[in-house]
Structure formats: C-alpha cells, structure tokens
C-alpha cells in the first residue's frame, strides 16, 4: 500500500524517501527533498527549494518553505533547510531566506514548534528548542540550542536568543537575550537565569552558582558591558558555562535585554 495519499499533489521534481508518509490534500512543490521516516499530514503546503531531513512530523495546515513577504525579495531561488526529528504542529509558517542575508532559513534537530508559530526569512534555529503556540520570529533571528520561547512571544528582526534562555509568555523582545537568561514582559526585561532549565538538563550546582554570580556582574553591579566582560574573564576560564554566557553578551549587535 502506498504511503502517499492519492489525493496529495507531489511535483515530479520532488524527492521523497520511500517510507515518507503524505496525507490527503497536501501539496509538495518542485525542488523539495524529504528524508526517511518523515510524516507530512493533510492540508500541508511545502514549497521549494526546501530540504527536510529524517524522522520529522509536520501537522495539518502548516506552510513550509513559502516565499517571504519581505519587499526586497524578488523571487530568487533561496532555501529552507530543516534537520532531523523535529515536530512541527498545526498551522506553522516557515519562510525561506533572502539573498540580502544567507539565502537560507535553517532549523536544527529535535525541536518542538507548536501551533501557529511563525519563523521568518533567514532565521537560524539550533536544536532542542521549544517554541510555544503563536510565538513569532521576524526575519534574521538567531535562536540558540535549548532555548524556550513561550506562547505569544514576539521577536524583533535580527535579535539573538541565546542558548538555554527562556522567554516568558507574551514577551516583546527587541534586543538580544544572552545565553541562560530569563526575560519577561513587553518590552522584555531580564529577570534571572533559567535555573529550572539548567536543573532539568543536569547542570552542576557549581556551574549554576557561577552563572548566578556572572548574572549579578552583568545586571546588578551597574557596570558597562565592557567592564562586565572584563570581570567575567576569570570565572569564564573555570566554567565553560560562564564562557558561553560571556560570549553571548559580547556577540550582541542590538544590545542585551536589561
């Protein structure tokens, strides 16, 4: 028995692994690759050029690899690349890149992207991230591994959301969020470190205490960013986690969320 519903429309140039499942009334366009073990539900649209890896599950009414509405986009053949073991729930929209940036939108592995999330053009998402219902990323956003974006969060274009960070429900983020930091509000403000996430992932008490001290250096001592980075140097040599935090602060291009 075919794993592709006869009511689905598959472009002849699309390449699907033999065990890919495709539901009814789904449209898969030209220049799409779908890897083994992936399941595409009913009423899904996948446009190319798009590369979807192995063992992903995409639910109904999602639109994957659509042209960006960015007014600079003039129909160039940009790409979307999705890794392995991702779950993309109902009504998600993910746009391809633009030639003004990387020409590619990239999603890593083992991400949970819940209903009605939007991921804009040229965004880069790491692995093991969770985006809760109706979170929206504008174009050119970078999201680090293990980040969690709660429901109805809005991320401004070109923002960096650091690894292991947590963005609270309904937050409006217009500046960069350093690694491990919890932010909340609209406009978002830094509240603490994401210690609950660290505990769940097995971080040592020593590393969490070092990050607690590092947070105070950046956010509680009235230092400039440059001064705080100098203060973090010794701790960063002892704890790789502090080095990750320091590097994310240093890499900020929009200024960090305070």
Swiss-Prot record:
Molecular function in Gene Ontology: acyl-[acyl-carrier-protein]-UDP-N-acetylglucosamine O-acyltransferase activity
CDD domains according to UniProt: LbH_UDP-GlcNAc_AT
GO biological process: lipid A biosynthetic process
PROSITE patterns the record matches: HEXAPEP_TRANSFERASES
Entry keyword annotation includes Lipid metabolism: yes
Cellular component, GO annotation: cytoplasm; membrane
Reactions the enzyme catalyzes: a (3R)-hydroxyacyl-[ACP] + UDP-N-acetyl-alpha-D-glucosamine = a UDP-3-O-[(3R)-3-hydroxyacyl]-N-acetyl-alpha-D-glucosamine + holo-[ACP]
EC number(s) reported in the record: 2.3.1.129
Subunit structure: Homotrimer.
Protein name in UniProt: Acyl-[acyl-carrier-protein]--UDP-N-acetylglucosamine O-acyltransferase
Species name: Azotobacter vinelandii (strain DJ / ATCC BAA-1303)
Gene behind this protein: lpxA
């Amino acid at each position: 028995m075919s794993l592709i519903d006869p009511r689905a429309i598959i472009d002849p140039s699309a390449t699907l692994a033999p065990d890919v499942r495709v539901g009814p009334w789904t449209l898969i366009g030209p220049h799409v690759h779908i890897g083994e073990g992936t399941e595409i539900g009913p009423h899904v649209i996948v446009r190319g050029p798009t590369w979807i890896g192995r063992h992903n599950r995409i639910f109904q009414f999602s639109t994957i690899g659509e042209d960006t509405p960015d007014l600079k986009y003039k129909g160039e053949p940009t790409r979307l690349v999705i890794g392995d073991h991702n779950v993309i729930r109902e009504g998600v929209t993910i746009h391809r890149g633009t030639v003004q940036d990387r020409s590619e939108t990239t999603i890593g592995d083992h991400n949970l992207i819940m209903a009605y999330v939007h991921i804009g053009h040229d965004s880069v998402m790491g692995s093991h991230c969770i985006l809760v219902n109706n979170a929206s990323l504008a174009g050119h956003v970078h999201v680090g591994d293990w980040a969690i974006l709660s429901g109805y969060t809005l991320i401004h274009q070109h923002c960096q959301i650091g690894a292991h960070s947590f963005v609270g429900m309904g937050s409006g983020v217009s500046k960069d969020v350093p690694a491990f930091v919890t932010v909340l509000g609209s406009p978002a403000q830094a509240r603490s470190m994401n210690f609950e996430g660290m505990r769940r992932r097995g971080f040592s008490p020593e590393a969490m205490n070092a990050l607690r001290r590092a947070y105070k250096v950046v956010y509680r001592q009235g230092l400039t960013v440059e001064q705080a980075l100098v203060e973090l140097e010794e701790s960063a040599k002892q704890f790789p986690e502090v080095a990750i935090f320091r590097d994310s602060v240093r890499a900020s291009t929009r200024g960090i969320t305070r």
